[in-house]
């Protein structure tokens, strides 16, 4: 019986993924800029200080802040943000391409 060739892992030919910390920093910057367009900077500073007091300068704290800001922005848009084009005259409905069922 012939000896089986040793198993080797497949070559990873996909591009190198961005390190997790850099990704979190990028997301934080994007969501911060969006939040500053819609909320009072003093509120955002207070929220950042609160998260920092609970988590310090950690990835868990950054994740918590991202989660809270995403929810706040979602609710803000859902309530009818003046700056949002979604649901506004001339803004177009992004779901209009989907035929009604």
From Swiss-Prot:
Alphabetical GO CC annotations of the entry are: host cell; host cell nucleus; virion component
A biological-process GO annotation: symbiont entry into host cell
**Positions of region (Disordered):** 1-21
Q: Which UniProt keywords apply?
A: Activator, AIDS, Cell cycle, Host G2/M cell cycle arrest by virus, Host nucleus, Host-virus interaction, Modulation of host cell cycle by virus, Phosphoprotein, Transcription, Transcription regulation, Viral penetration into host nucleus, Virion, Virus entry into host cell
Keyword Ribonucleoprotein present in the record's keywords: the answer is no
Pfam families, per the entry: VPR (PF00522)
- Positions of modified residues (Phosphoserine): 84
Subcellular location, in the record's words? Virion; Host nucleus
Subunit-level organization: Interacts with human UNG.
User: What's this protein's function?
Assistant: Stimulates gene expression driven by the HIV-2 LTR. Prevents infected cells from undergoing mitosis and proliferating, by inducing arrest or delay in the G2 phase of the cell cycle. Cell cycle arrest creates a favorable environment for maximizing viral expression and production.
Instruction: Please state what the protein is called.
Output: Protein Vpr
